[in-house]
């Protein structure tokens, strides 16, 4: 199961006593600020959590798995996430259920 924006808003509502509307708006503003920073080429650093970076990938050869045809994969910019030390430490010893 994945954590959703709606669940984040619900946590703000329950733990901080915000109205549901304000909690939803807060979550939206938070993610919009991250999007804006990345769109303008900035790194996003969230202390104790991790960093979002932009990385330029060069064009490279690829292959269509159905046809076997060689197809170039175009150059593009991607968002990467590097977890911080505190986040790594917290998830390091969690048992994974299958």
Swiss-Prot record:
Region (Disordered): 51-71
Record's subunit section: Heterodimer of an alpha and a beta chain.
Source domain of life: Bacteria
SUPFAM superfamilies assigned: IHF-like DNA-binding proteins
This protein's UniProt keywords: DNA recombination, DNA-binding, Transcription, Transcription regulation, Translation regulation
Keyword Transcription regulation: yes
InterPro entries: Hist_DNA-bd, Histone-like_DNA-bd_CS, IHF-like_DNA-bd_dom_sf, IHF_alpha
UniProt xrefs under CDD domains: IHF_A
MF terms (GO), sorted A to Z: DNA binding; structural constituent of chromatin
Gene coding for it: ihfA
Record GO biological process: DNA recombination; positive regulation of metabolic process; regulation of DNA-templated transcription; regulation of translation
NCBIfam families: himA (TIGR00987), PRK00285.1 (NF001401)
Family to which this protein belongs: Belongs to the bacterial histone-like protein family.
Record's function text: This protein is one of the two subunits of integration host factor, a specific DNA-binding protein that functions in genetic recombination as well as in transcriptional and translational control.
Gene source species: Vibrio cholerae serotype O1 (strain ATCC 39315 / El Tor Inaba N16961)
A GO CC term assigned to this protein in UniProt: cytosol
Name of the protein in question: Integration host factor subunit alpha
Keyword Transcription regulation carried by entry: yes
Pfam families listed in its UniProt record: Bac_DNA_binding (PF00216)
Basic and acidic residues bias spans: 53-69
